[in-house]
């Protein structure tokens, strides 16, 4: 938790592990039809696109078979795998890691994290001349899937056809709904400030912070009262509560990398797609600019307009965005009892995550560490 490190992966499976083994024929058809549509919409002939997707699907299935089971992705013991650059080069003999890191703008990659080693090894076996066409297909599909909803109506229709075929839900939206979603996704920093100005107050922020402090105090009392925990483990648990970060409503700073995005109007030669790319580039450059800095634990991983809350084990903090601090869960003008019965149970729930089967594997600084005694 004291430094930022790079994470690395190769091509992977686009769907969950069970899909490739037990998925219904209709769902598989919806998925492969979608991939084929992406390739034909980008200029390939129908027959060539179908052949490429068939080979790609088989590769995905092989990688999926070697990957972690779904429940293991929340197990830090299985996903926190650090490699030196030399170790990773040995694992990936056909990948020029130095060139990849340089092209990505990553510097000083002394340690690199791999979340799914099995999937990486299976994918690495495909990185040779014999699979060059497959790798080109994978790269093309990865790019198209990442931008499909920012392209023309044909790509949008292909996506909604996939959702209908896979989930049985017609998710087609009006242009207004699509525009609202794009604003939320691309201009989240600006929308967050506008939302807070309209729907949240400093008074509410202070009130909820006080409530959280009361809950943390009660947790400490109850931990100290347990007869099954050793004094050593109790002390560390209390320390984790004492250092737990509390984020309520909105961040203290509204600085945004969006300020540096080169947005151009149609009159200036810009388009919706070019502006999407400009925003994504600004976000990427912001990440790269801070890659050698210590993690900024004041940064938020949720937007203030998100109706949710979370505990982040790698920062040891809890976050309650302004949007969840609304009626009926919370009202600054309601009684304390009403608010305790609403947002109170969510506060208690999020604090508990610090000691669940995943959170308990991180210490007060957010570092993966076994701080429990063997007996406890």
PLM region spans:
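Intrinsically disordered, low-complexity linker/terminal regions across diverse proteins
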Residues: 91-94, 106, 113, 117, ...
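Noncatalytic, helix-rich "gating/capping" subdomain that lines the substrate-entry/channel surface
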Residues: 1-214
């Amino acid at each position: 938790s004291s430094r930022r490190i790079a994470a690395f992966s190769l091509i992977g499976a686009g769907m969950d592990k069970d899909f490739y083994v037990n998925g219904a024929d209709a769902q598989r058809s919806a998925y492969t039809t979608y991939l084929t549509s992406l390739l034909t919409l980008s200029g390939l002939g129908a027959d060539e696109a179908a052949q490429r997707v068939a080979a790609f699907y088989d590769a995905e299935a092989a990688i999926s078979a070697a990957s972690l089971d779904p429940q293991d992705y929340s197990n830090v013991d299985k996903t926190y795998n650090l490699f030196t650059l030399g170790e990773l080069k040995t694992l990936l003999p056909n990948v020029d890691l130095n060139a990849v890191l340089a092209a990505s703008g990553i510097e000083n990659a002394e340690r690199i994290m791999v979340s799914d080693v099995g999937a990486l090894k299976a994918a690495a076996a495909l990185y040779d001349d014999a699979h060059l066409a497959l790798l080109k297909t994978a790269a093309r599909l990865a790019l198209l899937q990442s931008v499909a909803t920012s392209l023309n109506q044909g790509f949008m229709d292909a996506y909604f056809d996939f959702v209908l075929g896979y989930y049985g839900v017609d998710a087609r939206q009006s242009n207004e709904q699509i525009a609202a979603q794009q604003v939320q996704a691309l201009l989240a920093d600006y929308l967050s400030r506008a939302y807070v100005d309209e729907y949240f107050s400093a008074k509410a922020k202070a009130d909820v912070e006080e409530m959280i402090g009361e809950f943390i105090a009660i947790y400490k009392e109850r931990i100290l009262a347990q007869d099954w925990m050793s004094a050593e483990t109790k002390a560390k648990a209390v320390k984790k509560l004492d250092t737990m970060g509390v984020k309520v409503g909105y961040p203290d700073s509204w600085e945004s990398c969006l300020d540096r995005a080169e947005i151009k109007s149609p009159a200036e030669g810009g388009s919706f797609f070019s502006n999407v790319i400009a925003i994504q580039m600004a976000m990427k450059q912001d990440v790269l600019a801070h890659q050698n800095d210590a993690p900024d634990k004041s940064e938020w991983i949720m937007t203030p307009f998100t109706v949710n809350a979370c505990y982040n084990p790698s920062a040891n903090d809890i976050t309650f965005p302004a949007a969840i601090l609304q009626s009926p869960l919370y009202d600054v003008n309601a009684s304390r009892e009403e608010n305790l019965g609403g947002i109170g149970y969510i506060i208690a729930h999020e604090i508990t995550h610090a000691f669940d089967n995943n959170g308990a594997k991180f210490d007060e600084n957010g570092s993966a560490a076994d701080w429990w005694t063997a007996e406890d």
